Amino acid sequence: MDFTSDTTNSHDTSNSHLSLEDAVGTHHAGEADVNIDGDEKQQLSLLDDDQVRALKLQEEKDALLTRRNTLLQEIQTYQNILMKENNSKTKNGDILQNDITQDFLNLISISSSNPNSAISDRKRVERINGLTNLQKELVTKYDTLPLLNMNLRLSYLRDHTYPHLQVSVQSRDRVHNDGIEVLVVNYKFCRNTMNPFEIQFKMFYKFEDSTLLKWEILRISTNVRLKAKQLLATRNFQKCLLSLYEFDKIKSKKTGIFQNLINLLKRKTRCYLMNNSDSLIVERVIREGRLTTIKLQINFIITMPGERGKPRNCFLPMSKISIALWKGGERFNQIDLDEICYGLIKEYGVKTGLKEICNVCLFPDMYAR
């Protein structure tokens, strides 16, 4: 069946485009007083089966042609959109391809202009160290080992490994002609912006073989002088720096935890710090026939390497958390308190665990319901 066009037929098809109702109506147009339904049935009975089938097929053909034209318009619309997208991608691809081609041609021209120089450069031994220019090191690098450039390595240490440590060289002097230099370097530990501390070293350094010969302490902040006394007595420079950095980290977390507890409890209790901010005291007054005071003390102690009670082989600071509880001046059993403290911190972590400890000790009515 051809749905494309009817213009090629030699015979007259004007009647074939009439609908079924139009064809029936032409036989009895003048009989207006006859019932319509009965008239249609009578007229259909006058048509043979072939004529009825032809009329139905013509109606289906017209509907299909209309649907076909609609689909062709949609196809044309999508083709136009696709052509626009392809044109834009082609332009971008041409630009990228041209850049790659131009770079390749430049490399060919450089290598072909003086091939002997490239071979001689490979044969010549290049000495690369931390003071070598970064671009020169990259040109001569054929392995996957870390870069030696001192500035690049220091930037990674500063930005990623020790982001809260500021290092500044105060002075640099050469001693005689043996390659030894005296550096005065200041280290500032500033994780806790409200209470930072500094330590200044005098170092005798031999750059030729990258050796730290000896070092001295010129100045140290008073807020860590007593705490770091045993650590600095070890005379291990790397151990001292790493331990002080970890001490600053733990101290900053302790300050944040105590401040969070104070903000949560200050409306219903009285909170204050003691023992150089190593202990938080929380007091609540309740009425049980008479006024009774519940006092909770949270101790957050940081022990440095070399202090008493610290494992011998441990070179990093450690923290120990304990609590003490009084009610009406009478102290509770410490063994039971230690078990409660250990269990809640193990279950919830330090921050949430201490919050639950405060609720259990200061607001027991919350758990009695």
UniProtKB/Swiss-Prot annotation:
Subcellular location: Nucleus; Chromosome, Centromere, Kinetochore
A Gene Ontology term for the protein's cellular component: nucleus
Segments forming a coiled coil: 51-87
Entry keyword set: Cell cycle, Cell division, Centromere, Chromosome, Coiled coil, Kinetochore, Meiosis, Mitosis, Nucleus
Residues spanning the signal sequence: none
GO biological process: attachment of spindle microtubules to kinetochore; cell division; chromosome segregation; establishment of mitotic sister chromatid cohesion; meiotic cell cycle; mitotic spindle assembly checkpoint signaling; protein localization to chromosome, centromeric region
Cross-referenced CDD domains: DRWD-C_ScCTF19, DRWD-N_ScCTF19
Family, similarity comment: Belongs to the CENP-P/CTF19 family.
Assembly description: Component of the heterotetrameric kinetochore subcomplex COMA, which consists of AME1, CTF19, MCM21 and OKP1. The COMA subcomplex is part of a larger constitutive centromere-associated network (CCAN) (also known as central kinetochore CTF19 complex in yeast), which is composed of at least AME1, CHL4, CNN1, CTF3, CTF19, IML3, MCM16, MCM21, MCM22, MHF1, MHF2, MIF2, NKP1, NKP2, OKP1 and WIP1. COMA binds the centromeric nucleosome-binding protein MIF2, and to the outer kinetochore MIND subcomplex. CTF19 interacts with the CTF3 complex subunits CTF3, MCM16 and MCM22 as well as CHL4 and IML3.
Stated role: Component of the kinetochore, a multiprotein complex that assembles on centromeric DNA and attaches chromosomes to spindle microtubules, mediating chromosome segregation and sister chromatid segregation during meiosis and mitosis. Component of the inner kinetochore COMA complex, which connects centromere-associated proteins and the outer kinetochore. COMA interacts with other inner kinetochore proteins to form the inner kinetochore constitutive centromere-associated network (CCAN), which serves as a structural platform for outer kinetochore assembly.
Other information: Present with 1254 molecules/cell in log phase SD medium.
Name of the protein in its database record: Inner kinetochore subunit CTF19
Gene it is expressed from: CTF19
